[in-house]
Amino acid sequence: DITPEEWQHMLDVNLTGAFNLCQLALPGMIRRKAGRILTVSSMWGQTGGSCEVHYSAAKAGLIGLTKALAKEEGPSGITVNCVAPGVIETDMMAAFTAEDKAALAEETPVGRLGSADEVAELLVFLAGENAGYITGQVFGVNGGLVI
């Protein structure tokens, strides 16, 4: 069960926060006719996660925000992209047992969990000059778990 307060908090942190940051950053980017906006969703934003409805909804909303902003801000030289990580070894995984992690790795086609560095490397590339023709995309960093 999710309370209305939990629902709203999840949306505020994962969707409204991103919207507010975009609102603050965009005027300067539009003036300069250049910029990169990167959002971080989740594979659950792409597929939905059982017992994760509020998280999945917030992350799916972030994907929608990314795509709409890409269309809106492209003419101003601003690209907007999203990274949707899968099972990544972070503090969010701290409560998982070694057996749970092994089972998740076994479900993943590449046979292991991802690292934060793998997500970060993609974000660095998308923030760079060589990514100027990439916009409105959702990049799964999930070892093939979501294909």
Model-derived regions, located:
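Alpha-helical segment proximal to the catalytic Tyr-Lys
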Residues: 27, 71-75, 132
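Active-site loop immediately N-terminal to the catalytic Tyr-X3-Lys motif
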Residues: 47-53, 75-76, 111, 129
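C-terminal substrate-recognition "lid" of short-chain dehydrogenase/reductases
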Residues: 19, 30, 34, 112-141, ...
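Active-site loop-to-helix junction immediately N-terminal to the catalytic Tyr of the SDR YXXXK motif
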Residues: 2, 48-56, 68, 96
